[in-house]
UniProtKB/Swiss-Prot annotation:
Coiled coil: none annotated. It comes from Schizosaccharomyces japonicus (strain yFS275 / FY16936). SMART domains: Ribosomal_S3Ae. GO terms for biological process: translation. Component of the small ribosomal subunit. Mature ribosomes consist of a small (40S) and a large (60S) subunit. The 40S subunit contains about 33 different proteins and 1 molecule of RNA (18S). The 60S subunit contains about 49 different proteins and 3 molecules of RNA (25S, 5.8S and 5S). PROSITE patterns: RIBOSOMAL_S3AE (PS01191). This is Small ribosomal subunit protein eS1. GO terms for cellular component: cytosol; cytosolic small ribosomal subunit. Belongs to the eukaryotic ribosomal protein eS1 family. It is found in: Cytoplasm. The lineage of its organism: Eukaryota, Fungi, Dikarya, Ascomycota, Taphrinomycotina.
Length: 252
C-alpha cells in the first residue's frame, strides 16, 4: 500500500469562509487638473490607497503620468490625433496638479501620412526653454508635387533632403528658443512650427503634411510651488477689479 497524503482527512472545518475585503474600501479618488493653457481643466480622476502608517497617499500620486487626447483638452475634434502626457507634481487636497510632460501623434494618423511616390523627411532638435525645461522636438514632413508637374513621383534628392533638414533645424530653433513651456505648448497646438517649415522649404522642394511628430521632455526644472500654482491659474500677481454696487440715495 502506497503511503501518501489522505485528501479526505486533510480537509478543514466546514462552514468557515475566508473574510473578503473590498479593495476599493481602502482607496480614494483624486481629481487630475491640467495646466491653465489648456481649455479643459478637469482631466479625470485617479485612484490611490489612503494614507496608512508610513505610506502617504500624496507620495504615491506624485510622479504619476497620465495620457490625454488633445481633443478632450481643447474641445476640438481636429486635435484627436494628438496625445498629451501630464505628470502629477503636487497634490492639494483632492486635486492633483499636473505639468506638461510630452506630446505625440497616434499611430493611425502617422501611418495614414506615409504613402508611395513621395519622400519622408524627419528631423529632431533639442532646445531649452526660459523656465528650465530641456526637450527634444521631432518633426516629420513629406514631399508633394510641384505646380503643373506631370511626373507621378515626388522624390527629393539627397542634397535637397539635407537642405530641408537644415531649414527644419533653424525653424525649430527660432520658434522654440526664448520662450517658456507655456508659450511653446501654445505654438504646438495650432501647428505653427509645421506651417513655418512649409514656408521656409518652399524654395527647395514643396512639402506637405508637416507636423511636430513628438515632443520628449529630457529634463525638468526643480519643483517650484509658486510657479506651479501660476500654471494652474491659482496664484496671480494681478487680481481682478471688483466693482461694488452703490446703493441709491434715499429721497428727502
Amino acid at each position: 500500500m502506497a503511503v501518501g497524503k489522505n485528501k479526505r482527512l486533510s480537509k478543514g472545518k466546514k462552514g468557515i469562509k475566508k473574510r473578503v475585503v473590498d479593495p476599493f474600501s481602502r482607496k480614494d479618488w483624486y481629481d487630475i487638473k491640467a495646466p491653465s493653457f489648456f481649455e479643459v481643466k478637469n482631466v479625470g480622476k485617479t485612484l490611490v490607497n489612503r494614507t496608512a502608517g508610513l505610506k502617504n497617499a500624496n507620495d504615491a500620486l506624485k510622479g504619476r503620468i497620465v495620457e490625454v487626447s488633445l481633443a478632450d483638452l481643447q474641445k476640438d475634434e481636429e486635435h484627436s490625433f494628438r496625445k498629451v502626457k501630464l505628470r502629477v507634481d503636487d497634490v492639494q487636497g483632492k486635486a492633483c496638479l499636473t505639468t506638461f510632460n510630452g506630446m505625440s501623434m497616434t499611430s493611425d494618423k502617422l501611418r495614414s501620412l506615409v504613402r508611395k511616390w513621395q519622400t519622408t523627411i524627419e528631423a529632431d532638435q533639442t532646445i531649452k526653454t526660459t523656465d528650465g525645461y530641456v526637450c527634444r522636438i521631432f518633426v516629420i514632413g513629406f514631399t508633394r508635387r510641384r505646380y503643373n508637374q506631370i511626373k507621378k513621383t515626388t522624390y527629393a534628392q539627397s542634397s535637397q533632403i539635407r537642405a530641408i533638414r537644415q531649414k527644419m533645424f533653424q525653424v525649430i530653433q527660432n520658434q522654440a528658443t526664448g520662450c517658456s513651456m507655456r508659450e511653446l505648448v501654445q505654438k504646438l497646438i495650432p501647428e505653427i512650427i509645421g506651417r513655418e517649415i512649409e514656408k521656409a522649404t518652399g524654395g527647395i522642394f514643396p512639402l506637405q503634411n508637416v507636423f511636430v511628430r513628438k515632443v520628449k521632455i529630457l529634463k525638468s526644472p526643480k519643483l517650484d510651488a509658486q510657479k506651479l500654482l501660476e500654471q494652474h491659474g491659482e496664484a496671480q500677481d494681478v487680481g481682478t477689479k471688483v466693482i461694488k454696487d452703490v446703493a441709491p440715495l434715499a429721497s428727502v
